[in-house]
Amino acid sequence: MRDDGTPSDMLYDRVSVSAEVYAALGDTPLLMSGDHTGDYNEVGVMKSLAVQMGVPSEDVFLDHEGYSTYESLYRAKAVFGAKRMIIITQEYHLHRALHIARELGMEAVGVSADLRPYRGQTRYNAREHLARFKDFFAAAKGEYDGHLDPPVDLNGDGNET
């Protein structure tokens, strides 16, 4: 997300592909996970954009504490009860996300959200190598030190998140 509160190109493309998948599958809830610290509300921006793209607000669930890929996926299972999922993210990041989901015992398939070249991709690739190393061990241990909210039913109303 940009400093002015608008979605970055990567974030925009993730939401755009998510809206396309939603339209193709129909009545499937979307779980948007990201950072919501203080005034930085990544998940709020994602939901607003998804709704603008035609996804009903009640079908968009927010995980406000998805500070890392591992945390997002752990919380998807522990808080939201996800057992099967479609992970939508950029290609460079997709393999790690799928590995984590599978290590946590979830069935997962991935859809690439690469709709254009991205500025700073070399930096993202370098960061991804470090994150793979870190998350490999975290996923193998299957532990989480963060806060877990009460369970949320993905068959409920996403507006309550």
What are these regions (language model features)?
Residues 1-126:
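A structural signal for short, hydrophobic/glycine-enriched beta-strand patches
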Residues 37-41, 109, 131-138, 154-159:
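A general structural signal for short secondary-structure boundary/capping elements
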Residues 125-147:
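A transmembrane-helix-recognition feature enriched in membrane-embedded lipid enzymes
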Residues 143-161:
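Short linear elements at protein peripheries
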